[in-house]
């Protein structure tokens, strides 16, 4: 079980379509479940246009993606995770339908995924991917969600 830590969380819904489904209390519980250290995190739900702009400007990829994580470290000795995590509502809803999951279930996975990225986890190599996916599966199970990698 991961250690629960102090959290300062800001949630922004410029794309308001999911704010009644993916509520602030749910988001707080999902973020806290994935935290290994104290954190200051902003979650922002955007439409496809903003998601595409951010992905193009920061990753050089000209399409909207499901989640983008921007991790910030003010100093290397800081124990506080600081990040902006951007979730694209359009992509989230499309992927949930394609994967036959509820929007809530898929959003929980993407939030956990983004929080792990903010803490330095990645999936560039097979070993990194295995470690990150194992953590995601454990965290989501603790939250009452099924393994997100089954039937993909």
From Swiss-Prot:
InterPro entries in the record: MetalPrtase_cat_dom_sf_prd (IPR023091), YbeY (IPR002036), YbeY_CS (IPR020549)
Organism: Janthinobacterium sp. (strain Marseille) (Minibacterium massiliensis)
Protein name from the UniProt record: Endoribonuclease YbeY
UniProt-listed NCBIfam families: rRNA maturation RNase YbeY (TIGR00043)
Localisation per UniProt entry: Cytoplasm
Keywords: Cytoplasm, Endonuclease, Hydrolase, Metal-binding, Nuclease, Ribosome biogenesis, rRNA processing, Zinc
GO MF term list: metalloendopeptidase activity; RNA endonuclease activity; zinc ion binding
GO biological process terms held by the UniProt record: rRNA processing
Family designation: Belongs to the endoribonuclease YbeY family.
EC number: 3.1.-.-
Cellular compartments per GO CC: cytoplasm
């Amino acid at each position: 079980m991961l250690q629960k830590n102090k959290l300062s969380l800001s949630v922004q819904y410029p794309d308001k379509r999911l704010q009644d489904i993916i509520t602030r209390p749910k988001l707080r519980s999902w973020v806290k479940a994935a935290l290994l250290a104290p954190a200051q995190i902003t979650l922002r739900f955007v439409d496809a246009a903003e998601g595409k702009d951010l992905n193009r400007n920061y990753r050089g990829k000209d399409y909207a993606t499901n989640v983008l994580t921007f991790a910030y470290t003010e100093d290397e000795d800081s124990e506080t995770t600081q990040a902006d995590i951007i979730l694209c509502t359009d992509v989230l809803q499309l992927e949930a339908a394609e994967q036959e999951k509820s929007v809530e279930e898929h959003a929980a996975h993407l939030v956990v995924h983004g929080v792990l990225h903010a803490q330095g986890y990645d999936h560039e190599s097979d070993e990194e991917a295995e470690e990150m996916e194992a953590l995601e599966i454990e965290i989501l199970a603790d939250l009452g969600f099924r393994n997100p990698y089954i039937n993909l």
